[in-house]
Amino acid sequence: MFKQFFSSSLKTLHVIPSKPFTRRLHNLFLRDRLKRLHHEDHNHQHHHDPMDPKLVKPGISNVNEHFVHDETFIKSYNKLIEGNKAFVKEKTNIHPDYFKELCKSQHPTYFFISCSDSRVPPNELTKTDPGEIFVHRNVANQVKRSDLNCQSALFYAVEALKVSHIIVLGHTHCGGIAAAAKNQSLGVVDLWLQNVRDIAVSNRAELGLIKNEHDFLDKLTELNIKHQALNVCKSAVVQKAWAEGRKLRVSGWMCDIETGYIKDLDVAQKDWEEIKKFFQFSFTQEKH
């Protein structure tokens, strides 16, 4: 590798090294490297190397000594690895070529924009397999024009994957919604949740009638899901798909964590019809 690196580097300078020259460079490099390794070993002889084979337990790599000797961490870590093995075994027992087929391509029907909350994983909630849904997740399931991550995923889902259904998935007991409802500074999170606060202000008359905090947060969650689903409708890539005659549906779902059940809020496209004249793009090219 060293020889190849030097040869390619010198070629860019229009110098073709001879074999003896390259060999000398190689030897000089190795000599210098050995000196530095010896120096480092001398300076750190009293420190434990976290990657020492004597310290590292099977199945764990790239962790420091503290975690290597933390039995709770080891059990938790190994649970993930064993869970993966069980998952693979379950799939291949039914269909031996499951993953060979899966790696060829993906053709998901659905694109989920979901909250990052660990209690609402879209695949598990809908009992879908790998390859069935394309997923983007963030705190409080936001769909912002300024969020290149979300907008890129949306564009890819519609234009490349040709999904037929986009679902914004929110949930009860959302920490992001609760944080947005409080008059308390949360640092950088304030910037992310400002949109939720704006939704609360825009609907203050309706929300002001609710006296119970639980009901207030549930209503704000619904309003947020509705707003984000409409933001999906406002996107150019979705409107372009509709202009081309594609049957692309947009929905807003709310998961009740207390029961596990999902409720279709039936809001997105119905409300879009009422406001589309203000946000609809034109995709016809003007004739000059």
PLM features: residue spans?
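Divalent-metal-activated hydrolytic enzyme cores
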Residues: 2-5, 9, 13-108, 140-152, ...
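N-terminal short beta-loop-beta anion/metal-coordinating cradle
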Residues: 90-132
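Short beta-strand segments
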Residues: 113-115, 137, 167-171, 251-256
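Gly/Ser/Thr-rich loops at beta-strand to alpha-helix junctions
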Residues: 117-119, 171-176
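Glycine/charged-rich beta-loop-alpha catalytic/anionic-binding loops adjacent to active sites
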Residues: 129-141
